Swiss-Prot record:
SMART domains named in the record: FBD
PROSITE patterns, per the entry: FBOX
LRR repeat windows: 135-166, 167-192, 235-261, 318-346
Superkingdom to which the source organism belongs: Eukaryota
Protein name, UniProt field: Putative F-box/FBD/LRR-repeat protein At2g05300
A Pfam family hit: FBD
Length: 438
């Protein structure tokens, strides 16, 4: 009786083992890789189940030595295994990487969909094998600190997301061919942290989102530039302090841009003026734009000798300003007649705002957008209620009959009562404007 009871209890406790292998594999797939592998000691039934898990994260740092890492990988990346691999995150060290070719070859054969490979130690000698260039199942590819060789033939028919950081390209053609051979590519992100001398040419009929970041530790270093030809592009993020030029030849009229460019601002000659002229021409078609302080200063310098284009499409603007640029800001707004939403970020202390400069702003002619379209204004930097700051608040409340909401963050709650008194003294042009104090 007691034996029968014990057997019954044992069966109840091990009901999970009675589930079919495909269902057990799905359960293991919910666990971190190292936890899934631990189940191999439960019984003979469980010994190899983890090998069929479709999602894996493999890092050399989880193993006592390189040989243990290599043995584990060779066991999983068996090209004869019939199961598909949906996704893999692979973290490499600086050891010899000859194992990469058979591993990646096996992944391509097993229909990998999402691949992330990152080298965390060593230089850039780890070269991705040629089989990766012809993977017909790959949907997402993210590579970090690796080398890509030139391939005569590239075919990635399903790739939608491509992210490359600190990648060494054999030449400019390697990158250009890679991007242009992805017919359904929608998102591209590139991070460059040294001067590789390449012109990055992006030609894509399907690309919708593009992020490019480039920087250098050397003040005098520059790179040739970037050329983008992507007619469906609707979101562009640029954080580039080293490129001599950045050209976008085609884009959606409703595009959203986040721009941090300086074009080596300290060398402002005729050639640079021509580049900036082209830059302004293509951003004039943007609907939603975010501009950093360096880029705004660049536009200001250009306007001192050449007229600005009309930013007729722009309805939303997020701009960071130095105190010295604030006086010129209304002039920029005159080129944005249909602006509806404005977010102002201040670079530097509020004490740098000049009362005389703000007086000149308040006495300048009112831009068309303030009179006909501006509905939302938000100050991002906390304000103290100082004279020059209040003059800027006065400028929007006094001159915009269409304003619906003004958002002001206070630096100190102790000034709130005094700040309210100052606000009540400002005449409002709009009868519907709501003032929100944060």
């Amino acid at each position: 009786m007691s034996c029968s009871k014990g057997l019954s209890q044992s069966l109840k406790e091990d009901r999970i083992s009675q589930l079919p292998d495909p269902l057990l594999t799905q359960i293991l797939n919910l666990l971190p890789t190292e936890e899934a592998v631990k189940t191999s000691v439960l019984s003979t039934r469980w010994r190899t189940l983890w090998l069929w898990v479709p999602n894996l994260e493999l890092s050399f740092s989880k193993f006592p030595c390189f040989n243990a890492f290599l043995s584990f990988g060779n066991l999983f990346f068996d090209s004869d295994r019939a199961s598909c691999v949906e996704s893999l995150k692979l973290y490499l060290d600086g050891n010899d990487a000859s194992y990469l070719k058979p591993w990646v070859d096996a992944l391509v054969k097993r229909k990998i969909q999402r691949l992330y490979v990152r080298r965390t130690l060593g230089g850039y000698s780890h070269v991705m094998p040629l089989s990766l260039y012809v993977c017909d199942s790959l949907v997402s590819l993210r590579l970090y600190r690796l080398s890509l060789v030139d391939a005569e033939f590239v075919s990635l028919p399903c790739l939608k997301i491509l992210r490359l950081k600190d990648i060494v390209f054999h030449n400019e053609t390697t990158f250009e061919r890679l991007v242009s051979s992805c017919p359904v590519l929608e998102e591209l992100k590139i991070d460059v942290v040294w001067n590789d001398g390449n012109v990055y040419k992006v030609h894509s009929r399907s690309l919708k989102r593009f992020c490019f970041r480039s920087s250098s530790l050397r003040f005098d270093e520059s790179v040739p530039g970037v050329v983008v030809d992507a007619p469906l592009l609707c979101c562009l993020i640029i954080d580039d302090s080293v490129s001599e030029s950045f050209v976008v030849t085609d884009l959606e009229s409703n595009a959203k841009f986040d721009i941090s460019l300086c074009f080596r601002l300290w060398r402002f000659d005729e050639a640079k003026r021509s580049i900036i002229n082209m830059f302004l021409a293509w951003i004039s078609r943007v609907r939603d734009m975010k501009i950093c302080a360096h880029t705004f200063k660049l536009i200001h310098r250009y306007s001192e000798s050449s007229p600005l284009p009309r930013f007729g499409y722009m309805s939303s603007l997020y701009v960071t300003l130095n105190a010295s640029e604030l006086e010129w800001f209304p002039i920029f707004l005159r080129s944005s007649p249909n602006l509806k939403s404005l977010i102002l970020e201040r670079s530097g202390s509020s004490h740098q705002l000049s009362r005389k400069a703000m007086e000149r702003v308040s006495m300048s002619s009112v831009p068309e957008c303030l009179l006909t379209s501006l509905e939302f204004v938000e100050f991002k930097a906390p304000i103290c209620g100082l004279g020059p700051e209040m003059m800027l608040v006065w400028y929007f409340l006094k001159n915009s009959p269409t304003l619906k909401k003004l958002t002001l963050p206070l630096k100190s709650h102790s000034t709130k009562d005094d700040f309210f008194k100052k606000l009540l003294e400002i005449p409002r042009c709009s009868t519907e404007c709501e003032i929100v104090i944060l």
